[in-house]
């Protein structure tokens, strides 16, 4: 298992980055906020999960180790594959996911595209006894984020990458300005999730 990967960003898209390590470029799928924070020719380190299929090997990467662990945990629920797990981690972080499941908050889970009431209830039932494993450790990959561009631009780029129009993305960014002002240290990932929640209303 590849649990951690570091390299120089050689390319990036809405939901992926290519990290060059000694001349070998590895494509890593990641949440839009993470991809938006990537800057060409800058170093990036991600906590990763390798998904093995008969015809493919896919590497998913996360800034926080807890989010990587949550990505793997939700896939133990029936009907949840890597793509849906990645969608979940694009909207909720590990702590928010654990809280939603523990408190049986299906409304929060339903904010994730692809999860309905029945699916949320099923996830809660199957994962409620497992979420204790998501206790925050405060461990983040060294050098994983490089805020070279304004946070507004990064969040907007991430939303557009998810399919929202530029206009909707800008409106969503405007709605989270107060959060950033109240907590200047708030991460791009958390701002992205807040913006997504405002769009889901």
Curated annotation (Swiss-Prot):
Superkingdom in the source lineage: Bacteria
Record Pfam families: HHH_5 (PF14520), RuvA_C (PF07499), RuvA_N (PF01330)
Family listed: Belongs to the RuvA family.
The protein's role, per its UniProt record: The RuvA-RuvB-RuvC complex processes Holliday junction (HJ) DNA during genetic recombination and DNA repair, while the RuvA-RuvB complex plays an important role in the rescue of blocked DNA replication forks via replication fork reversal (RFR). RuvA specifically binds to HJ cruciform DNA, conferring on it an open structure. The RuvB hexamer acts as an ATP-dependent pump, pulling dsDNA into and through the RuvAB complex. HJ branch migration allows RuvC to scan DNA until it finds its consensus sequence, where it cleaves and resolves the cruciform DNA.
Record note on domains: Has three domains with a flexible linker between the domains II and III and assumes an 'L' shape. Domain III is highly mobile and contacts RuvB.
HAMAP family named in the record: DNA_HJ_migration_RuvA
Protein name in UniProt: Holliday junction branch migration complex subunit RuvA
Originating gene: ruvA
């Amino acid at each position: 298992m590849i649990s951690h990967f570091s390299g120089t960003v050689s390319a990036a898209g809405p939901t992926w980055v290519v990290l060059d390590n000694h001349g070998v470029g590895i494509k890593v799928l990641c949440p839009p906020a993470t991809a938006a924070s990537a800057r060409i020719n800058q170093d990036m380190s991600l906590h990763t999960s390798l998904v093995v299929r008969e015809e493919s090997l896919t590497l998913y990467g996360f800034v926080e180790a807890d989010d990587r662990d949550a990505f793997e945990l939700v896939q133990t629920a029936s009907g949840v594959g890597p793509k849906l797990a990645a969608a979940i981690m694009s909207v909720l972080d590990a702590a928010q996911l654990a809280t939603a499941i523990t408190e049986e908050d299906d409304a929060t889970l339903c904010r994730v595209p692809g999860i309905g009431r029945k699916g949320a209830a099923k996830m809660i039932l199957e994962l409620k006894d497992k979420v204790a494993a998501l206790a925050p450790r405060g461990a983040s990959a060294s050098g994983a984020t490089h805020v070279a561009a304004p946070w507004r631009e990064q969040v907007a780029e991430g939303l557009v990458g998810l399919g929202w129009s530029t206009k909707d993305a800008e409106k969503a960014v405007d709605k989270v300005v107060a959060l950033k002002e109240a907590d200047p240290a708030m991460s791009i990932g958390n701002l992205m999730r807040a913006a997504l929640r405002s769009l889901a209303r």
